[in-house]
Structures are given as C-alpha cells and as structure tokens.
Amino acid sequence: SIFYCEYQNICVTLHQIRAFMNITLTYQRRQTTTTHVGGLSIGSKFPVRIQTMANTSTNNIEDSVTQAKHCVAAGSELLRFTTQGMREVESLALIHQALDGMVPLVADIHFQSDVADAAAQVVEKVRINPGNYIDPARKFKQIDYTEEEYQAELERLRNRFVLLINICKEHKT
C-alpha cells in the first residue's frame, strides 16, 4: 500500500528504505556499542534506524509538527531540524512539547557552539560538524598553521567540545 500525505516524497522514500533494510544482505555490521537517543536504542544488536530531516522552517511550529507526525507514520524513528540560532532552539522546544515524545528530535547545528549548548537542553540529540563548530564567521579560507598554532586550534576546539559534552551528559542528550 502507498502511504499518501502532503509530504508524499519523503514518506514513500522512507517506506522504500524500510523495505530495502528488511532484505537479507551479505553486509556484515561492525561491532558497536549501544547508545540511546531519547528512548531509542542505536548500535550493537539494534537495527539500523531511519532518520529524516524536516524541510519545514523550524520556526513554523504548526507545519513542523504536522510534518513530523507524517514522517513518524511513514516510519521515521529520528527527526532532524535545522537549528540556525536561538530562535530555532525556542521553536524546537515548542515542537518537542507538541510531539510529546512521539519521536526523538535532533538539532542540526553549524557554526554556533552556543546554539548547540542551548539545543542540547531541549532535544534528544545534537548534530554538529566539528569542522565548523567554532567558526561563527563562516570563513572558509585556507590557513597554513605552524605546528604550534595547529595544536592550539585543536585545543581550543577540544575545550569547547568538552563543554557541549558536559551539557549533553547533564541533560541526557
């Protein structure tokens, strides 16, 4: 049967992925440990999980909640929202509240580590790109570092990242 909804392309794709995943393949999974995103267990003996990304504006609460419900009905087990700033974090908190635990939410963050810190307090998972995690100016220029400068930059990233990890631990993100 075909699941029809306003977001049909997303839903059909999720069903196709689910059907494909149920086929026995010769693929051997690597041994991993279990991690949890909300009430969802990932890794080790658990199946590969279906995640999709909302294409609504995160600040449009009503459309985002509607799309999330459609995606869950189609088989999505995790739902990612773009989170550009603090306004989107506030919107994610409202979306999370409206969905009432229906699906774990993921904040997709680039460039703004302070936004990641705030999002980690309202959703089940935060996705960052370490390559642009602390680059708020979005300067994609090539820089030739000395070994000392390179190590200092790594230490700066490490220190900032540890702060996020501690927030995630505190909030079980």
Per-region residue spans from a language model:
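Alpha-helix-loop-beta-strand connector modules within alpha/beta enzyme cores
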Residues: 87-107, 156-172
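Short, well-ordered coil/turn segments that N-cap beta-strands
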Residues: 45-48, 75-77, 100-105, 122-124, ...
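Short, positively charged and aromatic/hydrophobic N-terminal segments
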Residues: 2-13
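N-terminal amphipathic alpha-helix/helix-capping segment at the start of soluble metabolic enzymes
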Residues: 21-53, 162-171
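Generic structural signal for hydrophobic
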Residues: 64, 68-71, 95, 118-119, ...
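Active-site mouth loops of central-metabolism enzymes
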Residues: 45-63, 82, 105-111
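Glycine-rich, proline-tolerant flexible connector loops at the mouths of alpha/beta enzymes
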Residues: 55, 73-99, 130-141, 145-149
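Active-site-facing alpha/beta catalytic cores
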Residues: 22, 115-173
